Amino acid sequence: MQLEKMITEGSNAASAEIDRVSTLEMCRIINDEDKTVPLAVERVLPDIAAAIDVIHTQVSGGGRLIYLGAGTSGRLGILDASECPPTYGVKPGLVVGLIAGGEYAIQHAVEGAEDSREGGVNDLKNIGLTAQDVVVGIAASGRTPYVIAGLEYARQLGCRTVGISCNPGSAVSSTAEFAITPVVGAEVVTGSSRMKAGTAQKLVLNMLSTGLMIKSGKVFGNLMVDVVATNEKLHVRQVNIVKNATGCNAEQAEAALIACERNCKTAIVMVLKNLDADEAKKCLDQHGGFIRKALEKE
């Protein structure tokens, strides 16, 4: 696909004279365009749901969720991956973000990195990619060689693959087993795909990782019951989670959390089933870590 023919490289009539308007009008133009992004994502919800189900199946069998991207796309993958351990208590290696150019590229532009097919393959080899893993290639244009080569290598290994782009019929979409293509149209600043396309990618990644965690028992109701208390705010959140899940008061919630080394799931089962910490943990283990299953009458 030629660059000049891509939707993400098109000219947006709504912003054709954005350099001549007031600051407030400038903001309105950008905001009006941003409003279209959730609607574009809504149109591909079935594709996102299909990807979540596959990711959950693979991760449940011992696989990992691997994000692969360049520039903004790579940074968004790293951002999503880095939030999973503190939010859901998973090991840091379960969700992995890879960016063309390596760690230096997180904060700096690395010339030519996205054009390196070898880089995409080598980065996956370096993390010991296996057929059980899922590789999600992220590229707004859908033409990034680093991502395409990585997806091709992953498929050769037998991995399930997902391609996220914002141009229909892109190479990323055709290379991946599952294509997620929110078409957000031309950017306010021509070709600046960190804007609407980046926002769409962020929304999709939010759904992929959150959907995986919900289906893995990391959420009870809408509570993040595997949150790790790494600061005072999260200590308070843990107490509120136990309170909201059980109806107990703050003192009871804190006492239960202390007794079970601050594991919200265990504390919730302790309170609701009147068990001690060891009994509650055993009950959870017997039910795969799912609170609802642990609470069912035996």
Swiss-Prot record:
Catalytic machinery residues: 83 (proton donor), 114
Catalytic activity: N-acetyl-D-muramate 6-phosphate + H2O = N-acetyl-D-glucosamine 6-phosphate + (R)-lactate
Annotated keywords: Carbohydrate metabolism, Lyase
GO molecular function, one term: ether hydrolase activity
Pathway membership: Amino-sugar metabolism; 1,6-anhydro-N-acetylmuramate degradation; Amino-sugar metabolism; N-acetylmuramate degradation; Cell wall biogenesis; peptidoglycan recycling
Key word Glycoprotein present: no
Lineage top rank: taxon: Bacteria
GO annotation, biological process: 1,6-anhydro-N-acetyl-beta-muramic acid catabolic process; amino sugar catabolic process; N-acetylmuramic acid catabolic process; peptidoglycan turnover
EC number in record: 4.2.1.126
InterPro entries per UniProt: Etherase_MurQ, Glucokinase_regulatory_CS, MURQ/GCKR, SIS_dom, SIS_dom_sf
Family statement: Belongs to the GCKR-like family. MurNAc-6-P etherase subfamily.
Miscellaneous comment: A lyase-type mechanism (elimination/hydration) is suggested for the cleavage of the lactyl ether bond of MurNAc 6-phosphate, with the formation of an alpha,beta-unsaturated aldehyde intermediate with (E)-stereochemistry, followed by the syn addition of water to give product.
Job of this protein: Specifically catalyzes the cleavage of the D-lactyl ether substituent of MurNAc 6-phosphate, producing GlcNAc 6-phosphate and D-lactate. Together with AnmK, is also required for the utilization of anhydro-N-acetylmuramic acid (anhMurNAc) either imported from the medium or derived from its own cell wall murein, and thus plays a role in cell wall recycling.
Quaternary state and interactors: Homodimer.
Entry protein name: N-acetylmuramic acid 6-phosphate etherase
Organism of provenance: Escherichia coli O6:H1 (strain CFT073 / ATCC 700928 / UPEC)
Gene responsible for this protein: murQ
